[in-house]
Structures are given as structure tokens and as C-alpha cells.
Amino acid sequence: MAPHAMYIGALWAVLSRLRRADPERYADRQLGSLAADLTPMEKAELYADGITPKRMGADETLRLKNGIKEIITEAEQAAVYEGLTGASPREMRTLLLDASQHPEYSCLSPLAVLSCIRALCRGGDYGFLRETPSAGYHDHAGFIEQVRERWLDRVDREFRDSTGLVEEARYGELFDRYITHVSHYIKGERVFNRVTGVNEEPDREMMASVEKTLGAGSNTDTFRRGLINAIAGYAIDHPGDKVEYGKVFPRHLERLKEAYFADRRKHLQEIGQDIMRRLADEAQDGLSHDRAELAKAASERLYARYGYNRDSLRDALGELLARRYKP
């Protein structure tokens, strides 16, 4: 079984069973409005991992996180309650069995699962497939591309991490340094430079560069104070714990990472193409020694870290390159 094949089937099945929230059932009308505004994918991610939409502000995010239990309870109260209709476990077992026997793939591949879901939607043999889409819900055929994109998000992260272009810890180190300088800037203090042993003014150029990447806007003082307040809030809620910026500011760290890889997109494309040549057993005479070794190392990391074999990697990476790394 290829990596993420079950994830694709499970995610599509969950999306097929979700219903839009009814804001009239909420005592907190603002929470009801936020819940009703969630797309099916956003609602699935909120239920599964407590992930809130990036498009929402800090106050909306907090209200939504605090109201997850109420959103779940509301969904259980309707006559046609959430989960009543949609793909059943039995139907998904049959679909996965069919996908595992797909003639175009040597294993249970995510692409085979997507193909079988598409065929299921075209057939319209089940009642839930004949539901009328509303506000993005019950759009079972439309969910296919959304699920594909979430799968490619995972493949993309695995591929980029496998290249070794930069270690994950580097983003944290940059953000740690940024927060240190912001904290001293707000307090009007100097920063101790461990290299020179001298107390120096906060690095305004570094702070401005990071803030540009984070989309801080023109009011940087407000942005900086918001960060420090968020850290203080985390410390109050988690007394005695070390503040983990990855938990407090996951989106900021993700933006730093995305910006780094955006600058290296062409290099990533070359590495991906070199890996595909290796998988196809094509001659690599035109590659430099360094490029050949990098492709080999990245392939081996994908095998060892993420459970790919040659066939499943060819399927996943080929799809990723075709959809996200076109020349």
C-alpha cells in the first residue's frame, strides 16, 4: 500500500458526511456564523486536528477553537444529523478493494483511490451521491480535487524535506532570534551578541525582513506587541512550560518555510526531474556528480522516512511535478 492511499479515502468519506452548521441553533450567534461559514474541508480539519482557517483573524480563531464542542453538539441535534448520509464504511471498503486491484497501479495507490472515487461519483448508485450541493457541502465530485490537493500538500512537504536543502530547525532558529530582538526592542533594551560578546541594538533590518515575509503590514509595532502578548498568554495557560513557538505561531513558521522554498523552486524542480530519471532507469550521463548524488540521497530519504517504494514514489512525485512544478 502506498503512502497516503488510506488518507485520501478517509478524507473524501468524511467530507461526504459533513453538513453545514445552522447558525440559528447557537446561543453564541457569532460562533454560529463562523461555524456556518466553514467549508467542508475547514470543518473536517477543525474536527480532526483543531486547525482553524488561515483566513480568520485572531479573535475569530480563538472563538472557533473554544467552540468546537458546541459545533459538534449542534451537528448531532438536527433531524438529518451530521454523519447520517454519506459514504459508509462498507462502501469505502469495497472502493478500496477495487482500487487495490486497479490494473494501472502495482499497489494500492492514491491515484487508484482517486480514480475509483471518480467512477463512484459518475455512477450515482447511492442516494448520498444525488444530494444537491449547497454552500460547498454535498459536492462529492468536487471533493475529489480538494482531496487531491491535500494529498499533494503532503507529498510536497515530504519531497522538499527529503532534498536536505535546509534543516527544519533553521526556521525555528530564525524565528527564535526574531522574537528575541522584538522583545528587546519593545523593552528598549540592547541584545547580547554571543559571537562578539557585545550588547547591541536590536537588528532592525533582520526584523523588517522577517516581518515582510510574515505579511506584518505597515504597523509593525502593533504586530510585534501582538506576538509578545501571544507568548505571554501561552505562558499563563501553560505555567512552568517552555514556550514552543511552533505551537504558538505555527502559521508564521510555515510562511518562513514557504518563502525559503519559493526562492528555490527551480532547484527543487531539477531535483524532482532527476529523481524521476532515476526511477525510470534513464541514463544520467548529462548530470553532474553532485546532481546525481543529490537525487539518489533524496530518493533514499523518501524510501526510509516515508515508506515509498519505486512505483509509489514514481506515482506521487510524477503527479506533484506535473501539477506544481511545471517549467
Residue ranges and their predicted role:
Residues 1-92:
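Conserved AAA+ ATPase small/helical "lid" subdomain
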Residues 89, 93-327:
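Terminal-proximal interaction/regulatory segments of ATP-powered molecular machines
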